């Protein structure tokens, strides 16, 4: 029995509403949890384990993304999406009920599985529902939703923690998630299986070994363990074994998680490389500009966080505009434009100095956001326009996967640049002054020299704490603090120049893209009608 035109439109509206709700709250989760961290540690303890709340989620969510995309192609969108939502909600409830930090970390890892499944699914479903111009428009809208969640997340998190308690940061996902499940389950097409499903178990296992080992090495290297320690070298070795094994397994699998033949497609390879390098720059700016604001300008941690707001607002604007603009100028020109705008923003960041105001710094971040909004949604659109519906899940999730890896790699690589550069600067500028101090200050000088040798970045971060600065003897602070500030500024310049290079490399890869043709208007109108009908006419079972 076929639905009326009004019934189909109603189900599609229901589905899109469910997608928006699910995507908004999964994006919101990361920012509001960060706001609640101090309260969580105050209640559960485990300060030394706090970073694992983020690391556990990162590990599981990043690893599951390509697996979710393949499962969506094999099993259908509805069962995979709804399963991800249910896992996310169940884990959220468990996080709220956690009695200690260890339990919370485990449940955050479980929550990451649900979040990682949800992450690519909205874009996959948009790719199913729409073609051409409509697809571009909705990719832009959903990119804007992600940006909006990043802007208002800290405010919502702060209100929840202050008005209720930190547990409601997790519990709030339950009523909202239930609504999203109902809307998506009712609006999204199911699939009737006609034959056996070949799960690539070996591919899943080798991917988990390779990706988790790599992310752990990048997360802990240079911070918890030295880069040449046996722990980090062992993780890199295990990552190499896992990735090589994954490539071998995937080349022979009947239903590979990430088919190796896709990398022979120039469009697939270069679009994911562009996304990888763009994410290095994006996460570099988000991570290291607050260092400048706190250490040089002297704003508080909460104030430095607001510097992200203009960047996200500008990203929201260009995400929406870009979804329409791409149909006029084309995919390749828009990506090049966005990457060049981002590069311009990074070039401006290299001009930050001791006299830079908060307004100037935020305006530079806003320029980077303009470029991000032009590029991010269009990368997914370009992949979807270049492949068949049968490959939509894999190619869409691959885009999110390589961006996540790029972000993690970028934070680690740029952090290493900052550490190395700051160590050299402090050795050149601060050590000669410490050597000139009188004998009675020898223990103080030795302490600072030890920090320069082992943790120069940590010494510079003492600028973020007024209490730490006050511990420097008054007789020496007038010399030491300016040296620390100029060293921090110069090391951040090196970080921003490195980020600029990565963005420039991404822009160069854009030149190698073949022209990607968007669906023409007449064909698009007909395809829209056919897709909408198929998407909402769900089998009864």
Swiss-Prot record:
Molecular function per GO: transmembrane transporter activity
Any one Gene Ontology BP term: transmembrane transport
GO cellular component: plasma membrane
Record's bilayer topology term: Multi-pass membrane protein
Transmembrane helix as UniProt keyword: yes
Effect of deleting the gene: Disruption of the gene completely abolishes the multidrug resistance observed in the mdtR mutant.
Stored CDD domains: MFS_Azr1_MDR_like
PROSITE patterns: MFS, SUGAR_TRANSPORT_1
InterPro entries: EmrB-like (IPR004638), MFS (IPR011701), MFS_dom (IPR020846), MFS_trans_sf (IPR036259), Sugar_transporter_CS (IPR005829)
Membrane-spanning segments: 14-34, 40-60, 79-99, 112-132, 141-161, 168-188, 201-221, 229-249, 273-293, 307-327, 329-349, 359-379, 401-420, 492-512
Induction info: Part of the mdtRP (yusOP) operon. Expression is repressed by the HTH-type transcriptional repressor MdtR. Induced by fusidic acid. The mdtRP expression is decreased during stationary phase, even in mdtR mutants.
Key words of the record: Cell membrane, Membrane, Transmembrane, Transmembrane helix, Transport
The keyword Disulfide bond appears for this protein: no
Subcellular location, record wording: Cell membrane
Primary residence: membrane
Protein family per UniProt: Belongs to the major facilitator superfamily. EmrB family.
Purpose: Multidrug efflux transporter. Contributes to resistance to several antibiotics, including fusidic acid, novobiocin, streptomycin and actinomycin, possibly by pumping these structurally unrelated antibiotics out of cells.
Protein name per Swiss-Prot or TrEMBL: Multidrug transporter protein MdtP
Organism classification: Bacteria, Bacillati, Bacillota, Bacilli, Bacillales
């Amino acid at each position: 029995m076929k639905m009326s035109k009004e019934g189909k439109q109603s189900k599609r509206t229901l589905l899109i509403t469910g997608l928006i709700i699910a995507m908004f709250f999964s994006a919101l989760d990361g920012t509001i949890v960060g706001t609640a961290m101090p309260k969580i540690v105050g209640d559960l303890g485990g300060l030394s384990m706090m970073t694992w709340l983020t690391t556990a989620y990162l590990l599981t969510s990043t690893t599951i993304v390509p697996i979710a995309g393949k499962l969506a192609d094999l099993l259908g969108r509805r069962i995979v999406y709804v399963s991800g939502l249910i896992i996310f909600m169940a884990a959220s409830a468990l996080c709220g009920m956690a009695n200690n930090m260890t339990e919370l970390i485990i449940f955050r890892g479980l929550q990451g599985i649900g979040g990682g499944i949800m992450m690519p699914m909205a874009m996959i479903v948009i790719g199913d529902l729409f073609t051409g111009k409509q697809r571009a428009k909705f990719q832009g809208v959903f990119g804007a939703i992600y940006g909006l969640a990043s802007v208002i997340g800290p405010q919502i998190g702060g209100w929840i923690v202050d008005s209720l308690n930190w547990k409601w940061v997790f519990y709030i996902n339950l009523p909202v998630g239930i609504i999203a499940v109902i809307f998506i389950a009712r609006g999204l097409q199911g699939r009737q299986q006609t034959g056996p499903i070949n799960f690539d178990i070996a591919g899943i296992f080798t991917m988990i070994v390779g990706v988790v080992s790599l992310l752990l090495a990048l997360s802990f290297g240079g911070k918890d363990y030295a880069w040449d320690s046996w722990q980090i070298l062992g993780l890199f070795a295990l990552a190499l074994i896992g990735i090589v094994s994954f490539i071998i397994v995937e080349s022979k699998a009947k239903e590979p998680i990430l088919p190796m033949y896709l990398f022979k497609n120039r469009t697939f390879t270069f679009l994911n490389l562009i996304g990888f390098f763009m994410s290095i720059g994006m996460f570099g700016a988000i991570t290291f500009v607050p260092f400048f604001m706190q250490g040089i300008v002297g704003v508080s941690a909460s104030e430095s966080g607001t510097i992200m707001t203009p960047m996200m607002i500008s990203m929201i604007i260009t995400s929406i505009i870009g979804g329409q603009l791409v149909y006029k100028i084309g995919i390749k020109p828009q990506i090049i434009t966005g990457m060049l705008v981002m590069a311009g923003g990074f070039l401006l960041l290299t001009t930050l100095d001791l006299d830079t105001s908060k307004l100037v710094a935020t305006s530079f971040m806003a320029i980077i956001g303009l470029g991000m909004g032009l590029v991010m949604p269009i990368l997914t659109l370009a992949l979807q326009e270049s492949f068949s519906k049968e490959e939509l899940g894999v190619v869409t999730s691959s885009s999110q996967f390589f961006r996540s890896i790029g972000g993690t790699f970028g934070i680690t690589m740029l952090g290493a640049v900052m550490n190395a550069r700051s160590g050299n600067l402090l050795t050149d500028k601060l050590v000669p002054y410490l050597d000139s101090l009188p004998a009675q200050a020898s223990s103080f000088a030795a302490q600072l020299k030890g920090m320069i040798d082992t943790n120069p970045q940590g010494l510079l971060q003492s600028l973020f704490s007024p209490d730490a600065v006050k511990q420097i003897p008054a007789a020496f602070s007038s010399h030491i603090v300016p040296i620390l500030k100029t060293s921090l500024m110069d090391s951040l310049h090196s970080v921003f120049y490195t980020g600029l290079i990565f963005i420039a490399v991404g822009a160069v890869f854009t030149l190698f893209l073949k022209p990607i043709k968007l669906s023409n208007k007449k064909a698009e109108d007909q395809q829209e009608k056919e897709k909408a009908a198929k998407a909402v006419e769900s089998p009864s079972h």
